[in-house]
Amino acid sequence: MEHRLWGGRFSEPTAAEMRRFNDSFHFDVRLAEVDIAGSIAWAGALLQAGLINETEHADLVRGLELVRAEFANGSFVAAAGDEDIHTAVERRLRELIGDAALKLHTGRSRNDQVATDMRLYTIGIARQLDRRLRDLQLALLAQAEQHTATVMPGYTHLQRAQPITFGHWCLAYVEMFARDRSRLNDAIRRMRVLPLGAGALAGNSLGVERERLTELLDEFDELSANSLDAVSDRDFVAEVLFACALIGVHLSRLAEDVILYASAEFGFLELADAYSTGSSLMPQKKNPDSMELLRGKSGRLLGNLVALLTVLKGLPLTYNKDMQEDKEPLFDSFDTLDLGLQVAAAAIATMTVRPERMAAALDDAMLATDLADELVRRGVPFRVAHSKVGQLVQRALTRGVSLRQLPLADYQAVEPSLDASIYDVFDMQRSVAQKASYGGTAPQRVREQCARWRDSLLNDE
């Protein structure tokens, strides 16, 4: 016989197509562990409220642990009528312990039950993603530590701008992913509000002490203060999906840089064979597919966020079945990022850096700002210095030479006070060393930041 949690007032069975449309067990089965944890806690609250006796409580806990073990070892068998994970667990529990299982749902609705499940699950995946991000930060940091003084072109508008160090580039992404971790952990704080005991929407009238539930479910440190909001709130899912989407954006930016830098036109980096693929037609090809997939999959992370927000935007209080659509976007974003972050960390850790190609891409024009700064040091107002260096750039272009090759006579024609010492500006290492302000690209500053991050990340296990 089918086991459903509702149906007494219905005079005909659910249509087959409606069941396929409505049932969610095939995807919410991954909530089994948190659903059972919530049910064990609920059984404890029922015992304290005198709604079940010691024997019934022991049977419920024993049965729930058996169901948990079946899910863990893969022996759980779904049955007809397993509409969702809650129904499946209760059905199997009754098979194992008999009618005592019928008391488990006393005073509880699937509305507060699933809200609790989703909070527990989302806390878990946020912590997992935080760990994955840390691994990626460590991979970037290791590269930065090896290249604190490796000079490369820095870009604005994808045009060569000023020299920077490769270590500084790596640490830029360490900073990005640190903000992502901060967002996840900030979201976790708001997830730790317990809705269990809110009932379907109006609260519980059977004397269940909700405070006891926060002791039994130690992931939660406060109770929801309004039962209507408790069962209809999915802000925490939206927050995590936003965090995932922004992680995806940052991964996409990292991937785009690596794709460019690994191309023959740049040649700054080379991905390991293990994180590249080939062509079915062109034997010479080595494609950066790991990075291209990271870039491409960021789109689905953005889509999952928009999908949930679109579901939520028109819902009246309180629970509506639309909210079933919160799960698949969340699950998909987690699965995508959990694997994607592992790939990103490994690809970064194993890529080869080509300092000689970076050095070959440097050109004197990138030191035009240094030239203007030197004029400022000699008392020329910056706007005037900027204009004068612009004139020198134009003279060099007209002559078909670099700024370093431009004759001193041209420099003195633009700024009479200049002498041969102006050519000292044309030193890439000198240029980056002078960018010694806090957060700058100077090798000493990069080494300081590497040490700070090494200490921070190793103490963050």
UniProtKB/Swiss-Prot annotation:
EC supergroup of this enzyme: lyase
EC number(s) reported in the record: 4.3.2.1
GO-annotated molecular function: argininosuccinate lyase activity
Classification via Pfam families: ASL_C2 (PF14698), Lyase_1 (PF00206)
Keyword tRNA-binding attributed: no
Functional pathway: Amino-acid biosynthesis; L-arginine biosynthesis; L-arginine from L-ornithine and carbamoyl phosphate: step 3/3
InterPro entries assigned: Arg_succ_lyase_C, Argininosuccinate_lyase, Fumarase/histidase_N, Fumarate_lyase_CS, Fumarate_lyase_fam, Fumarate_lyase_N, L-Aspartase-like
Annotated GO CC locations: cytosol
Compartments, as annotated in UniProt: Cytoplasm
Superkingdom of source: Bacteria
UniProt GO BP: arginine biosynthetic process via ornithine; L-arginine biosynthetic process
Keywords, comma-separated and alphabetical: Amino-acid biosynthesis, Arginine biosynthesis, Cytoplasm, Lyase
Gene3D superfamilies to which the protein is assigned, alphabetical: Fumarase/aspartase (C-terminal domain), Fumarase/aspartase (Central domain), Fumarase/aspartase (N-terminal domain)
This protein's record includes keyword Cytoplasm: yes
Reactions catalysed, as given in the entry: 2-(N(omega)-L-arginino)succinate = fumarate + L-arginine
NCBIfam families recorded: argH (TIGR00838)
Protein family membership: Belongs to the lyase 1 family. Argininosuccinate lyase subfamily.
Protein name (Swiss-Prot/TrEMBL): Argininosuccinate lyase
Gene label: argH
